[in-house]
């Protein structure tokens, strides 16, 4: 019942949310089955509500904690029109497990089970090769990069720049490591410069992930036009208390966001036209 509690909180706070529960065999087959059913029920419930503010996915932990039996159960119970959320090749152990137990690489196993597709979100993708990238591209599957989580867990650095260059829809996330997207933005910018030993890396790719990739990912699950200030689009706005010494203009906006702004400077938040926080005071909840 945890998904319904989270959905209730999302409704009360007015936050647009796409939810799923992490399926795995770590707590036994019964819990795995319950997890599959809770995801399926929440997906159907969100469709019935049809508010444009709540959506659902079939959540999975990672292939090394999900047996073929549970994969089959999830595939059989997933409602049409939605995809999966799964951690992929976050650690080298995930790859070693898949090769040892299934004789194939992780993305190949997911492909065989029909997991890939335009509504599926793959987290991390650190230990994948060119063939697997081809499969992700061919199936129009989405990827989310979580730089702080990968660094904090000492997992490694994913080939995110190559994913973007290949035209794979790639977004920027947190994996729950932080709730401040400006932190992920800053860390992603320097991580790939360091990893590639190239000071010119990531200047264009990271803004593309945050401001274009994330919007397109969200629009695959929500009906509204998102991420723009224009008539007909969802009124999602933040107001930032930012008064820089250096003038801000259309040519240097990204640098101001990257080097000057933080989440702590957000003073007002509007979601779907509803003011949620005004002058750092929560409006809709106690």
What are these regions (language model features)?
Residues 8, 72, 108, 133-134, ...:
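Alpha-helical segments flanking ligand/cofactor-binding loops in enzyme cores
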Residues 10, 58, 87, 122, ...:
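Divalent metal-coordination and catalytic microenvironments
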Residues 14-16, 77-83, 115-118, 135-144, ...:
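Glycine-enriched alpha-helix->loop->beta-strand junction motifs that scaffold or abut catalytic
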Residues 22-25, 90, 147-152, 175-177:
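Short, acidic/turn-prone active-site loops that include or flank metal/cofactor-
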Residues 92-104, 132-137, 154-163, 178-196:
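Histidine/acidic-residue-rich catalytic or RNA/ligand-binding cores of hydrolases
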Residues 112-115, 119, 161-244, 258-262:
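His/Asp/Glu-enriched, well-ordered alpha-helical/loop segment
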Residues 234-283:
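C-terminal cap of metal-dependent C-N hydrolases
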């Amino acid at each position: 019942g945890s998904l319904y509690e989270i959905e209730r909180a999302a409704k009360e706070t007015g936050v647009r949310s796409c939810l799923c529960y992490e399926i795995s065999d770590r707590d036994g087959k019964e819990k795995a089955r319950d997890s599959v059913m809770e995801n399926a029920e929440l997906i159907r419930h969100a469709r019935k509500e049809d508010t444009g503010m709540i959506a659902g996915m079939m959540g999975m932990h990672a292939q090394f904690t999900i047996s073929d039996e549970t994969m089959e159960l999830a595939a059989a119970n997933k409602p049409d029109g939605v995809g999966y959320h799964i951690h992929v090749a976050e650690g080298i152990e995930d790859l070693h497990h898949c090769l040892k137990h299934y004789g194939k690489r992780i993305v190949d196993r997911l492909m065989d089970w029909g997991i890939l597709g335009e509504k599926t979100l793959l987290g991390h993708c650190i230990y994948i090769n060119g063939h697997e990238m081809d499969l992700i591209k061919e199936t129009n599957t989405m990827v989310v990069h979580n730089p702080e989580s990968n660094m904090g867990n000492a997992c490694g650095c994913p080939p995110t720049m190559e994913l973007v260059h290949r035209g794979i829809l790639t977004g920027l996330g947190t994996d729950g490591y932080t709730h401040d997207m400006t932190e992920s933005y800053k860390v992603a910018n320097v991580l790939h410069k360091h990893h590639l030993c190239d000071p010119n890396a990531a200047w264009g790719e990271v803004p593309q992930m945050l401001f274009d990739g994330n919007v397109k990912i969200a629009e695959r699950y929500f009906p509204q036009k998102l991420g723009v200030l224009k008539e007909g689009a969802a009124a999602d706005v933040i107001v930032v208390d930012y008064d820089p010494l250096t003038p801000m203009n259309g040519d240097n906006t990204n640098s101001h966001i990257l080097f000057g702004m933080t989440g702590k400077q957000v003073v007002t938040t509007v979601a779907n036209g509803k003011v949620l926080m005004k002058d750092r005071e929560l409006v809709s909840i106690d």
